[in-house]
Regions:
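N-terminal export signals
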Residues: 6-27
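C-terminal segment of N-terminal export signals and the immediately downstream linker at the start
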Residues: 22-57
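Midchain, well-structured core segments that form catalytic/ion-binding scaffolds
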Residues: 35, 161-162, 166-330
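Zn-dependent metallopeptidase/amidohydrolase metal-coordination segment
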Residues: 37, 55-58, 115-116, 386-436, ...
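Active-site-adjacent substrate-binding region
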Residues: 54-58, 193-245, 283-288, 357, ...
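A non-catalytic alpha/beta surface segment that caps or lines the substrate-entry region
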Residues: 57-103
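Alpha-helical metal-binding/catalytic segments enriched in His/Glu/Asp
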Residues: 114, 123-160, 253-257, 268-289, ...
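His/Asp/Glu-rich mid-to-C-terminal helical/loop segments that flank catalytic regions of hydrolases
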Residues: 245-247, 263, 267-293, 341, ...
């Protein structure tokens, strides 16, 4: 067994050390630890994170462990071994998710589900999804060590391809469980020319059973997920725990502007129909309309494609994306219509044709009040300061909200950085989140069913 000092020295020079040193590189003062875990094994949890980070580790820093990649498969196989060693009944379901069940005293009670995902974005970090996954493993190990048998069965789940890198939509594994995967999605082809259904087969799933894999109504008590915040609110405020009130809804639109491509040197300024100029006005309009209303809604123009794309040709066609997020779907629907009307007027004034199509809409997923209550009480037991907050990023919990009550626990992301090799959460905060997950599950276990 390592001493605390030896363990910290190894961590400082290990796979997670590069992110850990970011604090000193940026000249920031280390903040006091406001939450101490006493029930879970903090060092074992951190070691599990370090071991997981080896799968897809990059020499330049960070991790690339794309869903349905060899590194993703290796990581899942490694965890399957850990779960079997912990005595769980382990399976790979039709969507290639890991499902590991621990029997309860009463099998007639619905199962308590908890977990996250282990895939990453390209050149991502070692904490997004991984904190929740390794904490779920640590919860099981802690229960085993303390000889605690819950009343309810426990179902640890690691969802496949949450990031959705190979294909257009994320949250694949959880959407499959919730019955939200359409048959045509299985035929989508990635950049290698491989269909999604082929990847599912290669990694132990069965695409033919995905349409029938949704658990029976009432068989899931609740779903609880621990995750890094992936934003800077907790970090800036120095608060170790976020109690998530809901995951925002998302509307994504494609705007197409058709102007007139022409010679950049011979066309007078007053005779131009420049689609890029109109696009610039629309981008500013999106920002102004989103910020003109009270609330926490956000809007982003994140992609823009200009044609013909030459320095001596007036842009004749522009396609851009507009994304709106808020806990109220009605608000972002109304905001989208305001943007549509404003953009149409701007385009008409410039003599540019305009169209705007909604391509994706994710409904907001509110967490269950009882689950939030018990997360809060678990934090109070540890004297951990909390902040009730919305999640601006999508998570598997929003798919599971279609099936059962859900809850989420956030831990801070240093400087709000995520999807980056510099993504980092301190060991003490990871352990604090894990113990609140553990305590909350035990509190929920006292309740037969949530109303």
């Amino acid at each position: 067994m390592l001493t605390r000092r030896e363990f910290n020295q190894q961590v400082a020079t290990g796979l997670l050390g590069a992110a850990a040193t970011a604090n000193s590189l940026w000249g920031q003062q280390e903040r006091p630890v406001l939450c101490q875990a006493t029930l879970v094994n903090s060092e074992r949890l951190w070691q599990s994170l370090q071991e997981l980070s080896r799968f897809g580790q990059l020499a330049a820093g960070g991790t690339t462990r794309i869903g349905f990649s060899p590194d993703d498969l290796a990581a899942h196989n490694w965890l399957l071994g850990m779960l079997r060693d912990a005595g769980l009944d382990v399976m790979v379901d039709a969507a290639a998710n890991i499902r590991a069940r621990r029997a309860g005293e009463r099998d007639d009670l619905p199962a308590l589900w908890f977990g996250s995902h282990m895939d990453t974005v390209p050149r991502g970090g070692n904490f997004d999804g991984c904190v929740g996954s390794m904490s779920a493993l640590e919860v099981i190990r802690t229960l085993n060590e303390k000889n605690i048998r819950t009343r309810h069965p426990l179902e640890l789940v690691i969802f496949r391809n949450e990031e959705g890198h190979h294909y257009s939509r994320g949250l694949f594994g959880s959407r499959a469980v919730a019955g939200l995967v359409e048959p045509e999605e299985l035929g989508l082809v990635d950049e290698q020319g491989v269909k999604l259904e082929e990847w599912i087969l290669r990694y132990g799933g069965d695409p033919n059973r995905i349409s029938r894999m949704t658990p029976p109504p009432g068989s899931i008590h609740s779903y609880l997920e621990l995750h890094i915040e992936q934003g800077g609110i907790l970090w800036r405020r120095g608060i170790p725990i976020g109690v998530v009130e809901g995951i925002v809804g998302i509307n994504e639109y494609t705007v197409v502007l058709e102007g007139k491509a022409n010679h950049a040197g011979t066309t007078p300024m007053d005779q131009r129909h420049d689609a890029l100029v109109t696009a610039s006005k629309i981008i500013l309009a999106v920002r102004n309309l989103v910020t003109s209303e009270p609330g926490r809604q956000v809007g982003t123009v994140g992609q823009i494609e200009v044609q013909p794309g030459a320095q001596n040709i007036i842009p004749g066609r522009v396609e851009l994306s507009v994304e709106l997020r808020d806990l109220s779907l009605e608000k972002i629907d109304a905001l989208g219509e305001r943007i549509r009307r404003r953009a149409a007027g701007l385009a008409a004034a410039d003599g540019v044709q305009f169209s705007m199509e909604k391509i994706i809409s994710y409904e907001p997923a509110l967490t269950h009040r009882a689950v939030r209550f018990h997360v809060q009480k678990a934090a109070e037991e540890m004297r951990a300061p909390t902040l009730t907050m919305a999640s601006g990023a999508g998570h598997d919990a929003q798919s599971m909200a279609r099936l059962c009550p859900v809850g989420m626990i956030f831990v801070p992301s240093r400087d709000g950085i995520s999807h980056s090799p510099l993504e980092y959460t301190r060991p003490e905060e990871v352990a604090c989140g894990c113990e609140i997950l553990y305590r909350t599950l035990l509190r929920l276990d006292r309740i037969n069913r949530l109303a």
